[in-house]
Regions:
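Internal helix-loop-helix
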Residues: 44-115, 156-162, 293, 297-309, ...
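A short core secondary-structure module
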Residues: 143-144, 148-194, 206
Length: 400
Protein backbone atom coordinates (compact mmCIF):
# COMPACT_ATOMS: atom_id res chain seq x y z
CA UNK A 1 0.00 0.00 0.00
CA UNK A 2 2.79 2.43 0.84
CA UNK A 3 4.25 1.98 -2.69
CA UNK A 4 1.12 3.23 -4.41
CA UNK A 5 1.09 6.76 -5.75
CA UNK A 6 -1.50 9.07 -4.27
CA UNK A 7 -3.58 8.82 -7.44
CA UNK A 8 -3.46 5.01 -7.48
CA UNK A 9 -4.46 5.01 -3.82
CA UNK A 10 -7.34 7.34 -4.63
CA UNK A 11 -8.58 4.91 -7.28
CA UNK A 12 -8.29 1.98 -4.89
CA UNK A 13 -10.22 3.77 -2.14
CA UNK A 14 -13.00 4.74 -4.54
CA UNK A 15 -13.26 1.17 -5.79
CA UNK A 16 -13.47 -0.07 -2.21
CA UNK A 17 -16.39 2.21 -1.37
CA UNK A 18 -18.14 1.84 -4.74
CA UNK A 19 -17.80 -1.91 -5.31
CA UNK A 20 -16.32 -3.85 -2.40
CA UNK A 21 -18.12 -2.43 0.62
CA UNK A 22 -21.72 -2.66 -0.69
CA UNK A 23 -21.20 -6.34 -1.45
CA UNK A 24 -19.66 -6.96 1.98
CA UNK A 25 -22.52 -5.31 3.89
CA UNK A 26 -25.35 -6.74 1.81
CA UNK A 27 -27.73 -8.76 3.97
CA UNK A 28 -25.96 -8.04 7.27
CA UNK A 29 -28.21 -6.66 10.02
CA UNK A 30 -27.35 -4.99 13.32
CA UNK A 31 -24.95 -2.21 14.19
CA UNK A 32 -22.19 -4.36 15.67
CA UNK A 33 -22.33 -7.03 12.96
CA UNK A 34 -22.23 -4.46 10.17
CA UNK A 35 -19.47 -2.56 11.93
CA UNK A 36 -17.34 -5.68 12.27
CA UNK A 37 -17.88 -6.56 8.61
CA UNK A 38 -16.87 -3.04 7.56
CA UNK A 39 -13.70 -2.99 9.68
CA UNK A 40 -12.67 -6.47 8.52
CA UNK A 41 -13.09 -5.54 4.86
CA UNK A 42 -11.18 -2.30 5.37
CA UNK A 43 -8.32 -4.10 7.11
CA UNK A 44 -8.19 -6.97 4.62
CA UNK A 45 -7.93 -4.47 1.74
CA UNK A 46 -5.03 -2.66 3.40
CA UNK A 47 -6.93 0.53 4.19
CA UNK A 48 -7.57 0.30 7.94
CA UNK A 49 -4.13 1.37 9.17
CA UNK A 50 -2.32 3.35 6.50
CA UNK A 51 -0.03 5.05 9.03
CA UNK A 52 0.84 1.93 11.08
CA UNK A 53 4.02 -0.15 10.64
CA UNK A 54 3.63 -3.07 8.25
CA UNK A 55 4.39 -5.65 10.95
CA UNK A 56 1.18 -4.68 12.74
CA UNK A 57 -1.00 -4.76 9.64
CA UNK A 58 -0.34 -1.20 8.53
CA UNK A 59 0.81 0.43 5.33
CA UNK A 60 3.45 2.91 6.49
CA UNK A 61 1.80 5.60 4.37
CA UNK A 62 2.95 9.18 3.91
CA UNK A 63 1.01 12.20 5.24
CA UNK A 64 -0.19 12.91 1.71
CA UNK A 65 -1.65 9.40 1.46
CA UNK A 66 -3.51 9.95 4.72
CA UNK A 67 -4.99 13.12 3.30
CA UNK A 68 -6.11 11.18 0.22
CA UNK A 69 -7.89 8.78 2.56
CA UNK A 70 -9.57 11.64 4.43
CA UNK A 71 -10.71 13.24 1.18
CA UNK A 72 -12.05 10.07 -0.41
CA UNK A 73 -13.68 8.62 2.73
CA UNK A 74 -15.39 11.84 3.81
CA UNK A 75 -19.11 11.20 4.12
CA UNK A 76 -18.76 7.55 3.03
CA UNK A 77 -17.73 5.80 6.24
CA UNK A 78 -20.65 3.69 7.51
CA UNK A 79 -22.30 4.99 10.65
CA UNK A 80 -21.58 1.66 12.32
CA UNK A 81 -17.89 2.61 12.48
CA UNK A 82 -18.67 4.63 15.63
CA UNK A 83 -18.62 1.30 17.51
CA UNK A 84 -14.83 1.31 17.03
CA UNK A 85 -14.17 4.98 17.70
CA UNK A 86 -12.43 4.42 21.04
CA UNK A 87 -10.47 1.37 19.95
CA UNK A 88 -9.28 2.59 16.55
CA UNK A 89 -9.10 6.29 17.37
CA UNK A 90 -7.63 6.19 20.89
CA UNK A 91 -6.54 2.81 22.25
CA UNK A 92 -4.72 1.55 19.15
CA UNK A 93 -2.53 4.63 18.57
CA UNK A 94 -1.67 4.73 22.29
CA UNK A 95 -0.59 1.08 22.27
CA UNK A 96 1.25 1.62 18.98
CA UNK A 97 3.22 4.53 20.41
CA UNK A 98 3.74 3.46 24.03
CA UNK A 99 2.88 -0.21 24.44
CA UNK A 100 5.30 -3.10 24.80
CA UNK A 101 6.04 -5.33 21.84
CA UNK A 102 3.85 -8.01 23.42
CA UNK A 103 0.90 -5.62 23.66
CA UNK A 104 1.38 -4.37 20.11
CA UNK A 105 1.34 -7.88 18.66
CA UNK A 106 -1.57 -8.97 20.83
CA UNK A 107 -3.93 -6.00 20.34
CA UNK A 108 -3.15 -3.86 17.28
CA UNK A 109 -4.25 -6.08 14.41
CA UNK A 110 -7.43 -7.40 16.11
CA UNK A 111 -8.37 -3.87 17.19
CA UNK A 112 -7.82 -2.34 13.78
CA UNK A 113 -9.70 -5.18 12.11
CA UNK A 114 -12.67 -4.78 14.43
CA UNK A 115 -12.39 -8.20 16.01
CA UNK A 116 -12.39 -6.57 19.46
CA UNK A 117 -14.34 -3.55 20.72
CA UNK A 118 -12.80 -1.18 23.26
CA UNK A 119 -13.97 1.33 25.82
CA UNK A 120 -12.16 3.90 27.97
CA UNK A 121 -12.31 3.70 31.78
CA UNK A 122 -11.14 7.17 32.82
CA UNK A 123 -13.71 9.39 34.54
CA UNK A 124 -15.05 8.65 38.01
CA UNK A 125 -17.93 10.17 40.00
CA UNK A 126 -15.47 12.49 41.75
CA UNK A 127 -12.81 12.75 39.04
CA UNK A 128 -13.79 14.36 35.76
CA UNK A 129 -11.84 17.43 34.72
CA UNK A 130 -9.47 16.70 37.62
CA UNK A 131 -8.83 13.22 36.29
CA UNK A 132 -5.65 12.74 38.32
CA UNK A 133 -7.74 12.64 41.51
CA UNK A 134 -9.09 9.20 40.54
CA UNK A 135 -9.42 6.61 43.34
CA UNK A 136 -9.86 3.30 41.51
CA UNK A 137 -7.26 1.04 43.08
CA UNK A 138 -5.00 -1.59 41.46
CA UNK A 139 -2.84 -3.89 43.61
CA UNK A 140 -0.43 -6.54 42.37
CA UNK A 141 -1.29 -10.10 43.41
CA UNK A 142 1.19 -12.57 41.93
CA UNK A 143 0.83 -12.51 38.15
CA UNK A 144 -2.29 -10.33 38.17
CA UNK A 145 -3.41 -6.86 39.15
CA UNK A 146 -6.57 -6.72 41.26
CA UNK A 147 -8.71 -3.68 40.47
CA UNK A 148 -11.51 -2.18 42.57
CA UNK A 149 -13.36 1.07 41.96
CA UNK A 150 -16.04 2.84 39.92
CA UNK A 151 -15.95 4.55 36.53
CA UNK A 152 -18.62 6.66 34.87
CA UNK A 153 -19.55 8.20 31.48
CA UNK A 154 -18.04 5.20 29.73
CA UNK A 155 -19.10 5.09 26.08
CA UNK A 156 -19.86 1.63 24.72
CA UNK A 157 -18.89 -0.31 27.85
CA UNK A 158 -21.90 -2.60 27.41
CA UNK A 159 -20.54 -3.73 24.05
CA UNK A 160 -16.80 -3.92 24.77
CA UNK A 161 -14.42 -6.80 25.27
CA UNK A 162 -11.47 -4.66 26.37
CA UNK A 163 -10.86 -1.33 28.09
CA UNK A 164 -8.10 1.19 28.57
CA UNK A 165 -8.09 1.63 32.35
CA UNK A 166 -6.50 4.22 34.63
CA UNK A 167 -6.04 3.12 38.24
CA UNK A 168 -4.01 4.26 41.24
CA UNK A 169 -1.09 2.00 42.11
CA UNK A 170 0.80 4.23 44.56
CA UNK A 171 -1.18 6.18 47.14
CA UNK A 172 1.90 7.77 48.68
CA UNK A 173 3.03 9.46 45.46
CA UNK A 174 1.62 12.83 44.27
CA UNK A 175 -1.61 12.32 42.39
CA UNK A 176 -0.15 12.51 38.87
CA UNK A 177 2.72 10.16 39.71
CA UNK A 178 0.88 7.20 41.24
CA UNK A 179 -1.33 6.23 38.29
CA UNK A 180 -0.89 3.28 35.94
CA UNK A 181 -2.55 2.57 32.58
CA UNK A 182 -3.81 -0.99 32.00
CA UNK A 183 -5.62 -3.06 29.41
CA UNK A 184 -8.61 -4.53 31.27
CA UNK A 185 -10.61 -7.55 30.03
CA UNK A 186 -14.25 -6.47 30.34
CA UNK A 187 -15.86 -9.91 30.11
CA UNK A 188 -15.15 -11.15 33.62
CA UNK A 189 -17.04 -11.60 36.87
CA UNK A 190 -15.57 -8.53 38.58
CA UNK A 191 -16.92 -6.07 35.98
CA UNK A 192 -20.51 -4.77 36.16
CA UNK A 193 -21.85 -2.36 33.54
CA UNK A 194 -24.96 -0.23 34.13
CA UNK A 195 -26.43 2.04 31.41
CA UNK A 196 -27.00 5.76 31.95
CA UNK A 197 -30.07 7.18 30.21
CA UNK A 198 -29.45 10.60 28.65
CA UNK A 199 -32.00 13.35 28.08
CA UNK A 200 -32.07 12.20 24.45
CA UNK A 201 -33.61 8.95 25.66
CA UNK A 202 -30.71 6.74 24.58
CA UNK A 203 -27.93 5.16 26.62
CA UNK A 204 -24.59 5.81 24.96
CA UNK A 205 -22.85 6.03 28.33
CA UNK A 206 -22.47 3.65 31.24
CA UNK A 207 -21.17 3.45 34.76
CA UNK A 208 -18.80 0.56 35.43
CA UNK A 209 -18.24 -1.09 38.81
CA UNK A 210 -14.97 -2.99 39.29
CA UNK A 211 -14.90 -5.46 42.17
CA UNK A 212 -11.58 -7.28 42.34
CA UNK A 213 -11.41 -7.39 38.56
CA UNK A 214 -8.27 -9.05 37.22
CA UNK A 215 -5.63 -7.77 34.78
CA UNK A 216 -2.60 -9.80 33.61
CA UNK A 217 0.60 -8.45 35.16
CA UNK A 218 2.16 -7.45 31.84
CA UNK A 219 -0.90 -5.69 30.42
CA UNK A 220 0.49 -2.31 31.46
CA UNK A 221 0.89 0.51 28.92
CA UNK A 222 4.01 2.51 29.73
CA UNK A 223 5.48 2.20 33.21
CA UNK A 224 3.90 1.25 36.52
CA UNK A 225 3.12 4.54 38.32
CA UNK A 226 3.91 6.33 35.05
CA UNK A 227 0.42 6.20 33.58
CA UNK A 228 -0.20 9.93 33.41
CA UNK A 229 1.93 10.38 30.28
CA UNK A 230 0.05 7.70 28.26
CA UNK A 231 -3.22 9.03 29.70
CA UNK A 232 -2.47 12.47 28.26
CA UNK A 233 -1.33 10.88 24.99
CA UNK A 234 -4.62 9.01 24.65
CA UNK A 235 -6.59 12.19 25.35
CA UNK A 236 -4.63 13.91 22.58
CA UNK A 237 -5.67 11.14 20.19
CA UNK A 238 -9.27 11.53 21.37
CA UNK A 239 -9.22 15.28 20.79
CA UNK A 240 -7.57 14.79 17.42
CA UNK A 241 -10.33 12.38 16.42
CA UNK A 242 -13.03 14.69 17.78
CA UNK A 243 -11.50 17.68 16.05
CA UNK A 244 -11.02 16.27 12.57
CA UNK A 245 -13.90 13.88 11.85
CA UNK A 246 -15.64 14.30 8.54
CA UNK A 247 -18.41 16.88 8.59
CA UNK A 248 -19.57 16.73 4.99
CA UNK A 249 -21.86 13.78 5.77
CA UNK A 250 -24.40 12.00 3.63
CA UNK A 251 -27.96 11.00 4.38
CA UNK A 252 -26.65 7.60 5.44
CA UNK A 253 -24.38 9.19 8.01
CA UNK A 254 -27.08 11.30 9.62
CA UNK A 255 -27.60 8.94 12.52
CA UNK A 256 -24.11 9.25 13.93
CA UNK A 257 -25.99 10.21 17.07
CA UNK A 258 -25.03 13.86 17.13
CA UNK A 259 -21.31 13.14 17.33
CA UNK A 260 -20.64 15.23 14.22
CA UNK A 261 -21.90 18.77 13.64
CA UNK A 262 -24.90 19.01 11.34
CA UNK A 263 -23.45 19.44 7.82
CA UNK A 264 -24.31 22.69 6.06
CA UNK A 265 -25.82 20.70 3.18
CA UNK A 266 -28.46 19.30 5.53
CA UNK A 267 -29.15 22.73 7.02
CA UNK A 268 -29.68 24.01 3.48
CA UNK A 269 -32.27 21.27 2.97
CA UNK A 270 -33.96 22.28 6.21
CA UNK A 271 -33.96 25.96 5.21
CA UNK A 272 -35.56 24.99 1.89
CA UNK A 273 -38.30 23.04 3.67
CA UNK A 274 -38.89 25.95 6.04
CA UNK A 275 -39.11 28.42 3.14
CA UNK A 276 -36.17 30.43 4.49
CA UNK A 277 -33.37 29.61 2.08
CA UNK A 278 -33.31 33.22 0.85
CA UNK A 279 -33.53 34.72 4.34
CA UNK A 280 -30.56 37.11 4.68
CA UNK A 281 -29.85 36.20 8.31
CA UNK A 282 -30.01 32.46 7.64
CA UNK A 283 -27.76 32.81 4.59
CA UNK A 284 -25.20 34.68 6.69
CA UNK A 285 -25.25 32.00 9.38
CA UNK A 286 -24.92 29.23 6.80
CA UNK A 287 -21.96 31.05 5.23
CA UNK A 288 -20.29 31.15 8.65
CA UNK A 289 -20.94 27.45 9.13
CA UNK A 290 -19.54 26.66 5.68
CA UNK A 291 -16.36 28.51 6.62
CA UNK A 292 -16.24 26.52 9.85
CA UNK A 293 -16.51 23.23 7.95
CA UNK A 294 -13.54 24.21 5.81
CA UNK A 295 -11.51 25.30 8.83
CA UNK A 296 -12.05 21.96 10.58
CA UNK A 297 -11.10 20.12 7.39
CA UNK A 298 -7.89 22.14 7.00
CA UNK A 299 -6.99 21.79 10.67
CA UNK A 300 -7.15 18.03 10.23
CA UNK A 301 -4.97 18.16 7.15
CA UNK A 302 -2.35 20.31 8.91
CA UNK A 303 -2.14 18.13 12.01
CA UNK A 304 -2.44 21.02 14.47
CA UNK A 305 -2.60 20.69 18.25
CA UNK A 306 -5.55 18.37 19.04
CA UNK A 307 -7.15 20.90 21.39
CA UNK A 308 -7.47 23.43 18.55
CA UNK A 309 -9.36 20.95 16.39
CA UNK A 310 -11.66 19.91 19.21
CA UNK A 311 -12.49 23.50 20.15
CA UNK A 312 -13.36 24.37 16.56
CA UNK A 313 -15.42 21.25 16.02
CA UNK A 314 -17.52 21.55 19.16
CA UNK A 315 -18.05 25.26 18.45
CA UNK A 316 -19.23 24.28 14.96
CA UNK A 317 -21.59 21.72 16.46
CA UNK A 318 -23.22 24.22 18.80
CA UNK A 319 -23.57 26.85 16.08
CA UNK A 320 -25.10 24.36 13.64
CA UNK A 321 -27.57 23.17 16.27
CA UNK A 322 -28.59 26.77 17.00
CA UNK A 323 -29.32 27.36 13.32
CA UNK A 324 -31.28 24.10 13.15
CA UNK A 325 -33.31 25.17 16.19
CA UNK A 326 -34.25 28.42 14.45
CA UNK A 327 -35.30 26.56 11.30
CA UNK A 328 -36.83 23.28 12.40
CA UNK A 329 -40.52 22.55 12.33
CA UNK A 330 -42.15 21.74 15.65
CA UNK A 331 -41.66 18.05 14.92
CA UNK A 332 -38.00 18.66 14.24
CA UNK A 333 -37.46 19.95 17.75
CA UNK A 334 -39.09 16.91 19.32
CA UNK A 335 -37.20 13.89 20.50
CA UNK A 336 -38.77 10.83 22.09
CA UNK A 337 -37.09 8.11 24.09
CA UNK A 338 -38.73 5.49 21.88
CA UNK A 339 -37.14 6.83 18.68
CA UNK A 340 -34.42 4.66 17.18
CA UNK A 341 -31.05 6.43 17.03
CA UNK A 342 -29.66 3.57 14.92
CA UNK A 343 -31.77 4.40 11.88
CA UNK A 344 -31.67 7.24 9.39
CA UNK A 345 -33.43 10.19 10.94
CA UNK A 346 -35.57 12.88 9.40
CA UNK A 347 -37.17 15.65 11.46
CA UNK A 348 -36.18 14.00 14.74
CA UNK A 349 -32.55 13.99 13.60
CA UNK A 350 -32.30 17.73 14.21
CA UNK A 351 -33.97 17.43 17.60
CA UNK A 352 -31.39 14.88 18.66
CA UNK A 353 -28.52 17.13 17.58
CA UNK A 354 -29.98 20.11 19.41
CA UNK A 355 -30.16 18.11 22.64
CA UNK A 356 -26.84 16.32 22.25
CA UNK A 357 -24.42 18.94 20.89
CA UNK A 358 -23.69 20.59 24.25
CA UNK A 359 -22.44 17.31 25.64
CA UNK A 360 -19.89 17.06 22.85
CA UNK A 361 -18.20 20.13 24.36
CA UNK A 362 -17.69 18.16 27.58
CA UNK A 363 -16.50 14.75 26.35
CA UNK A 364 -12.74 14.42 25.98
CA UNK A 365 -12.16 17.50 28.11
CA UNK A 366 -14.27 20.64 28.42
CA UNK A 367 -13.64 23.73 26.32
CA UNK A 368 -12.08 25.35 29.39
CA UNK A 369 -9.65 22.44 29.77
CA UNK A 370 -8.73 22.72 26.08
CA UNK A 371 -7.95 26.43 26.46
CA UNK A 372 -5.81 25.75 29.53
CA UNK A 373 -3.95 23.06 27.61
CA UNK A 374 -3.30 25.39 24.67
CA UNK A 375 -2.22 28.22 26.93
CA UNK A 376 0.24 26.13 28.92
CA UNK A 377 1.56 23.67 26.32
CA UNK A 378 1.25 25.53 23.04
CA UNK A 379 1.71 29.17 24.07
CA UNK A 380 4.00 28.60 27.05
CA UNK A 381 1.89 30.61 29.48
CA UNK A 382 2.36 30.03 33.24
CA UNK A 383 0.57 26.99 34.63
CA UNK A 384 -2.35 27.42 36.93
CA UNK A 385 -1.23 27.12 40.56
CA UNK A 386 -1.59 23.59 41.90
CA UNK A 387 -1.25 23.44 45.66
CA UNK A 388 -1.64 19.64 45.61
CA UNK A 389 0.80 18.96 42.79
CA UNK A 390 3.60 17.60 45.00
CA UNK A 391 1.55 16.36 47.96
CA UNK A 392 1.24 12.58 48.50
CA UNK A 393 -2.21 11.53 47.33
CA UNK A 394 -2.91 9.79 50.63
CA UNK A 395 -2.57 13.17 52.39
CA UNK A 396 -5.07 15.00 50.18
CA UNK A 397 -8.58 15.66 51.55
CA UNK A 398 -11.23 13.65 49.73
CA UNK A 399 -14.96 13.21 49.98
CA UNK A 400 -15.96 10.24 52.11
Amino acid sequence: MSQLSDEDLRVQIRRFFDEVLPAVLEGIEGTTARGKAWRAALFDHGLAALDYPAEYGGGGASPSALQVWRDESRGRIPREDTVFGIGVGMAMPTIRDLGSEELKRRFLAPGLRGDEIWCQLYSEPGSGSDLASLTTRAELDGDEWVVTGQKVWTSGAHNSQLAILLARTDWDAPKHRGITMFVLPMEQQGVEVRPLIQMTGVSEFNEVFLTEARVPRDWVIGEVNGGWAPAVSLLAHERQATGTKSMSGTTASRSKAGRSPIPVAQLLELAERAGRRDDAVIRQELARLHSGEQIVKWLGARGVHPSIGKLWRTKQGRAAADVAASLAFAGGLAWGADLDVERNLDDDYFGYHILNCRGMSLGGGTDEIQRNTLGERALGLPREPGVDRNTPFSDLPRNA
